[in-house]
Amino acid sequence: MKGSSKAIKRVLEHLQSTGRVLGTVESKVPAGISEEAALSGGHQQLQIKKPLILQFRSYNPYLVKEDIVSILPENQYKKRGQFTNGLDFQLIKVRDPKYFQFKDQYYLLFNDHNSLVEYADLTRLSRINKVRVRMTPLMQPLPNLMTKFQRYSQNLHNAFQSSEKYFEGLTEKIDAKNMIDVTQLWRVLDSVREMESKSVLVWNFPTELQSSNILNYFWFYNIRSSFKMYWDDEMKRNLRFISFENSNDAYRFKRNYHGLLAKELLNPPRKEKDTLETNSVIDDSKLLIEHLNE
């Protein structure tokens, strides 16, 4: 009995002095990772083994953070506007860095991995608009994501200035940083919010309207810049970027022209005879407008 009590006493004294149980080995910093990086949270390991982003695929481009928060169990019986969210995250609508088109997916960026795991567990069997929610951890390293979002931010900023800056900037390199944290990524995303609210993408804009005379044609909107980002003359398809001086004009432009026939934009028919005359001359495709802030 005395021998066992001495052994127990020895274990307790060792645990009190070192904080480790007898027989354990101190963890060592892997080769290639500095002690400073390990003490600061080991970002390099975190980016690979502990993702901070959930990927959510959806064809609905109009989801907002409130939709994602609504499926938490605590909000099941609450009205919209009364939802609570103890697992804070930022909802990111993923867009193509070059043409700014919505890529049918959202990212949920969390502050820490534990919050990500908890949210995924709580919403595993949930539905949004009657569609089963399927979210998967994004294993892509944070610096790679940062590079993509920086590319998008830079291209949007250039497009907001002029077509010349946009096309020249497409070939510029983006410097990838090794050590990236969540707050840096948030800053990049926040930097484009205002520009997104003042920008629209327009498919099937009438080719008869050139960038030089669009400002005069739409004189009642305060347009900042307008140019074709993509065009296919054979298929009669084009994608135009238009930026405005204020977000209200961008919103009104989409509301007034989305779904309108191109021929009606150029020459609004007043009589049935006018309609018949324009059908054979002007493209009858519809304008599809996307407000980048939606």
Swiss-Prot record:
The answer to whether UniProt assigns keyword Metal-binding to this entry is: no
Q: Look up the record and report any one GO term of the cellular component aspect.
A: mitochondrial inner membrane
Keyword set includes RNA-binding: yes
Q: Where in the cell is it found?
A: Mitochondrion inner membrane
Leader sequence residues: none
Look up and give the membrane topology term: Peripheral membrane protein
Q: Which GO terms describe its molecular function?
A: RNA binding
Keywords of the record, alphabetical order, are: Activator, Membrane, Mitochondrion, Mitochondrion inner membrane, mRNA processing, RNA-binding, Translation regulation
The principal location of this protein is mitochondrion
A Gene Ontology biological process term: mRNA processing
Protein purpose:
Activator of specific mitochondrial mRNAs. PET54 is involved in the excision of intron aI5-beta from pre-mRNA for cytochrome c oxidase I (COX1) and plays a role in promoting the translation of COX3.
- Supply the name of the protein: Protein PET54
Classification lineage: Eukaryota, Fungi, Dikarya, Ascomycota, Saccharomycotina
Q: Which gene encodes it?
A: PET54
